[in-house]
């Protein structure tokens, strides 16, 4: 059951007739608004409209304050469980040396193990743009070296004077 910030409660309900549900979930039938309010007040609870679009609208007898608190608690828990995925960038060059490549590879692996995506980019300077295949080989090697912990989300593609490759961590769940 989702909660709207402006749920109609007690006197805020405009419908004349309501299908009433008791606090323990049993159907109490169709009642007038006055009867439903009287039943709710006698139990020291609130009358909350839960399905305004139904014919007749459905109202439930409950402790509205407690209900709001529980819903907010659920929303907070759901927000805590959400994982924010960051995209980290590793910049390479087409003429990268072996040790430099290994350092960049180590950084990329570290990001992937943390659960972040990795965007590997190669910037071509000057006339190096004529040898795109060299940059392609560097990115392919990076994808190959991280194949055990990552999948290629976006294959290497040119964008202006740069070539990009996106890697996403594999889900082992």
Curated annotation (Swiss-Prot):
Keyword Magnesium: no
UniProt keywords, alphabetically: Cytoplasm, Initiation factor, Protein biosynthesis
MF-aspect GO terms: ribosome binding; translation initiation factor activity
Keyword presence, Lipoprotein: no
Protein localization: Cytoplasm
Alphabetized Pfam families for the sequence: IF3_C, IF3_N
CC per GO annotation: cytosol; membrane
InterPro entries reported for this sequence: T_IF-3_C_sf, T_IF-3_N_sf, Translation_initiation_fac3_CS, Translation_initiation_fac_3, Translation_initiation_fac_3_C, Translation_initiation_fac_3_N
Gene Ontology biological process terms in this record: ribosome disassembly
Quaternary data: Monomer.
Stated family: Belongs to the IF-3 family.
Functional description taken from the UniProt entry: IF-3 binds to the 30S ribosomal subunit and shifts the equilibrium between 70S ribosomes and their 50S and 30S subunits in favor of the free subunits, thus enhancing the availability of 30S subunits on which protein synthesis initiation begins.
Stated name of the protein: Translation initiation factor IF-3
């Amino acid at each position: 059951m989702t909660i709207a910030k402006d749920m109609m409660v007690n006197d805020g309900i405009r419908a004349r007739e309501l299908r009433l549900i008791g606090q323990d979930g049993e159907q109490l039938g169709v009642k007038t608004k006055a009867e439903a309010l009287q039943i709710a007040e006698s139990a020291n609870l609130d009358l909350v409209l839960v399905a305004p679009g139904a014919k007749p609208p459905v109202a439930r007898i409950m402790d509205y304050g407690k209900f709001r608190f529980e819903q907010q608690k659920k929303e907070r828990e759901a927000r805590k469980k959400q994982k924010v995925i960051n995209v980290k960038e590793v910049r390479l060059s087409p003429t990268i040396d072996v040790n430099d490549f290994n350092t960049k590879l180590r950084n990329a692996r570290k990001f992937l193990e943390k659960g972040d995506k990795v965007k590997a980019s190669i910037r071509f300077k000057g006339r190096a743009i004529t040898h795109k295949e060299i940059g392609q080989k560097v990115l392919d090697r990076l994808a190959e070296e991280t194949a055990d912990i990552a999948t290629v989300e976006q294959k290497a593609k040119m964008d202006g004077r740069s070539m990009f490759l996106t890697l996403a961590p594999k889900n082992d769940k």
